Amino acid sequence: MSRRGGGPVTVLNVAEKPSVAKSVAGILSRGTFRTREGRSRYNKIFEFDYAINGQPCRMLMTSVIGHLMELEFADRYRKWHSCDPADLYQAPVMKHVPEDKKDIKKTLEEEARKSDWLVLWLDCDREGENIAFEVVDVCRAVKHNLFIRRAHFSALIDRDIHEAVQNLRDPNQLFAEAVDARQEIDLRIGASFTRFQTMLLRDRFAIDSTGEERSRVISYGPCQFPTLGFIVERYWEIQAHEPEEFWTINCSHQSEEGLATFNWMRGHLFDYASAVILYEMCVEEPTATVMNVPHPRERFKYPPYPLNTIELEKRASRYFRLSSEHTMKVAEELYQAGFISYPRTETDSFSSRTDLRAMVEEQTRHPAWGSYAQRLLEPEGGLWRNPANGGHDDKAHPPIHPTKFSSGESNWSRDHLNVYELVVRHYLACVSQPAVAAETTVEIDIAGERFSASGRAILAKNYLEVYRFESWGGSVIPVYEKGQQFIPTTLTLDAAVTRPPPLLCEADLLSCMDKAGIGTDATMHDHIKKLLDRGYATKDANTRFSPTNLGEALVMGYDDMGYELWKPNLRALMEHDMNEVSVGRKTKAEVLETCLQQMKACFLDARVKKSKLLEAMTIFFERSNNTDESESQTAGEVVRRCNLCNESDMALRKNRDGNFMVGCMNYPQCRNAVWLPGPTLEASVTTNVCQSCGPGPVYKILFKFRQIGIPPGFDVNHLGCVGGCDDILKQLIDICGTGSRSQARRTPGTAPSNNIQGSNTRQSNVCIHCQQRGHASTNCPSRVPASRNSRPTATNPRNDESTVSCNTCGSQCVLRTANTEANRGRQFFSCPTQGCSFFAWEDSINNSSGNATTGSNSGGSGRRGSRGRGRGGRGGQSSGGRRGSGTSFVSATGEPVSGIRCFSCGDPSHFANACPNRNNSNGNYF
């Protein structure tokens, strides 16, 4: 594209960093650029003239600082308690320019308005391509007809930069979409699990010894946790190791030609008696006979493949004990100064078009390796060898290689010198011949036991001359002939013990991540750094990793759930799918749908199994003593949208009295609440959605009731809905009351009101037998017609003698007294036959109501209970029942209990000195 009339065009050039912008401007202008200030004081604008493919251009070169935009949730979802964390898997997200980048955005807008072309000089990887499209979005918003092109370069040297600007290409939309997919997946998964973990654990446990528990975020990252998993798994392997003693026979022979050490070909034995027998046989007949002396074999030790990012990080860690994060920081600085090529690359094979000899020639002046570089270039020396192909090519950058000679700059640290030396020596080794050695193995026989010794003689060091980081150890052994006999100099039985593997060092951890496909070459070091920064792992002086208590507890909790959220499999599949997007085999939408559906299912199930996480944390941490009522309420699980304020969700909560309720998260602005049955021992929100209630979704709650607190016939486990459709919950509230404080203080004789959503009055028109409305249980059409004796009757009500017959099995019923808070002192008939669920209030029969109340199973699935507080609502007055002298108390299940009650909570199953709520209440129980 050129301007009409052949005049110069104005070209806006944008680099990823200010230093890169200055370097590119310096190369293209040959140091003659003019500088002016932009809106951001860090991102200056460089002006110069240049010709692109013969087209005169007025070049404007500026920069961004990394990503120009951030991906965020819509405002409504940003506050932690504004929504159910599960909603974050489908909540709207948007890209926006953060406040600290607004000045850069203004600079781009102003310069784009007066430009004809936009040339993108961002780093040539997926992340750089994504930043490029962020720049495009900003510039096109103010000038839609910009001519947009992309410059591809791998080193900040004259040759690469001039070639890049003369061969501009289209930006790669697929690369940018792959990064968009990764950002959205990481945001949704990370935010949901981070909120879940933090709200669940932070206020329950004393995690931070510095006293900053309340501000701590217990984060989850899709790459971070599998990386932590490698560390924990190795740690567990070490902890589980049990040392085992073993024995081996060692033999050596000293001659005039030197020492030969022979190894037992059995290796070792774990049975001491067997080892001793074999050793004694050798001692009794110690003469050694040479059985086999093969001709020396030529062996080769090949140089390494060309250097990619992962190998650079691993080798810098092994050779110099540099962290991967620091290695990349130093390498980036060397790249920006023009001394090495772009350091973030997966490629480990050079293109056939690369001028390999020119890079060697640059190094011939170096005092340490210059002479070796000169020998490489001499044809008669035979030292040159084309580098091997490692099999990886990211199509964006060549392997890491030196681009400019230096014997050490004045501003370089020791780490800069080491990393530069590693890059240069590695490249020189790649283009060198392999080392050659002659290897000999001698086998001997002593009393029927075989031993062997190996010797190696180096014939040509070749690449090992320059690659000082590797060696080829070996010893020269004396010359032996087949059939030769000798007496060993030493023959010993030595004991040793098995040892566990060592803790993972940084190089090992990078290898695990690379093999499992966790992260990319550009991000692996960052994932490791985050583990250390967030206190999930520590690193010792030998660069070996150990998990902290918090890191181990989190992995243990998820492992106990049965989900492999800490294993690499799930993340490896995501990384594979994102790579498929970058090559066009899958769309961004397909990958997002697949990954997020899978992870949302994991999240919902993990939330149901949260007790596993709590149990694991209990092993490592003390319970926190700073949790107050308001904080415990904020840690609830979302049940539904609040139908009163329509602004926040309603969450399951447990107050300090141990009673459960579903309350609006917008409290105290909104006080909408649904109190649950008083006998509720445990309650957890499930992933089951009620098909009847709305506005949805309304998630069902899994209840576990105290057996002593519910009437016969009701199951202790119940999967119920608080949206208004669950008749079983309504009946339990009618009979047993709720845990609300107002109800606990009601006057004697006041009937409990049903507070399940959608019903504020007693539902007397619901059949307790079939759970249908419109008839009483005595008129239920699904029941067998009552015989003369099946209808419960009380023929002598004034004499406390039961004449009521069970209408199920015909047995004579027993008169008992209820002990639940809502009906304490009220008498009822129940069948003494084991397994029979017949139940009827005595006063309803005497009033000729004929309603025999029987419980029905809820059909809810059971689950293993945890330790409960053993109480429902606070102790109240008995309501409406007769308590004659001599009448014994019984539980609602019909079991007799003492007439003496706990004066703290009113429960007759224990005395006050054994009350489980003794230390958790304010003492007002009357």
From Swiss-Prot:
Domain of life assignment: Eukaryota
Catalytic reaction(s) noted: ATP-independent breakage of single-stranded DNA, followed by passage and rejoining
Start-end of GRF-type zinc fingers: 806-845
UniProt keywords, alphabetically: DNA-binding, Isomerase, Magnesium, Meiosis, Metal-binding, Repeat, Topoisomerase, Zinc, Zinc-finger
Region (Interaction with DNA): 219-224
Keyword Isomerase belongs to the record: yes
Residue ranges annotated for the Toprim domain, each copy included: 10-154
Coiled coil: none
Any one GO biological process: DNA repair
Bias (Polar residues): 750-760
Domain Topo IA-type catalytic: 172-604
Homology family: Belongs to the type IA topoisomerase family.
Protein name (record): DNA topoisomerase 3-alpha
Lineage per the UniProt record: Eukaryota, Viridiplantae, Streptophyta, Embryophyta, Tracheophyta
